[in-house]
Amino acid sequence: SKGIIEKCMETNPKAMVGYGPDGGYPEGFGYWGYGTSFQVMLIAALESAFGTDNGLSQAPGFKKSARFMQYMTAPSGDCFCFSDSPVEAECNMMMFWFAGKEKDLSLLWIERQYLDRPDMQFAEDRLLPSLMVFCSQLDLNRIGKPKKNFWFNRGDTPVFIYRGGWDSKKDTYLGVKGGSPSTSHAHMDAGSFIFERDGVRWAMDLGMQSYITLESKGVDLWNMSQNGQRWEVFRLSNVAHNTLTINGERHLVESNAPITRTFESKKQKGAEV
């Protein structure tokens, strides 16, 4: 076991590079929940057993990524579903760990809404028991709403978010992303956006398609080369996204679209890609 732990401490930092430099998670909402749950459980186990995580939680952008995750949920309750993410957002138990770690209960503003909904069920979440541990020192009656309405991260998948508020399903929401189709689990969606207002998602992303529905039909889903079959799947292609398509051609897999400018004033809100 000593050798396994030592090997883990040596190699795990390589997996945490994706959170840098400022908290954006390149694979989007769905895989933040998947990958970060394992990362948090590792850190929590190390801290419980040894009193330290040897600096893993200090990796650039890691703790900031909880705020990224929060901004990914729109006022409608659905998420900004770029890359292989489902449209439906869900409660993530790891957010409670981050709230305790950062001593910032505002990180739980949206998670609390999930807990208060009588139609939400969590029994199938394999990490549900961790909620009791992570919440043991938190006063969930003192959760305040976030203070900011803008999010912007750089990194492999730059993302800009504007929320008109945190109180109503009718609040305005704009999500813009850059990046590259070559990123893990990416779609050809660089330059795309979603937009909500008055409780309606006026500009949408179709989100991921179930892997089993494609792989069971023999689709070579993980060939991400320029001519790979992955890009024949409609909802993964650029023509299915709110972005530019020229002469019906695919985006270049090896291309990259940075967010070069953001607008965060009362008169102008948005991003240039």
Model-derived features: where do they sit?
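Conserved aromatic-histidine-acidic binding/catalytic patches
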Residues: 23-31, 54-57, 232
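Active-site lining segments of carbohydrate-active enzymes
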Residues: 1-30, 131-147
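Amphipathic, well-ordered alpha-helical segments in soluble domains
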Residues: 7-11, 35-42, 240
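Carbohydrate-active enzyme catalytic cores, enriched for enzymes
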Residues: 34-202, 260-272
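Flexible glycine/proline-enriched surface loops and loop-helix/loop-strand junctions
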Residues: 21-25, 51, 177, 226-228
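Hydrophobic/aromatic-lined pockets within catalytic cores
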Residues: 9, 13-16, 20, 44-51, ...
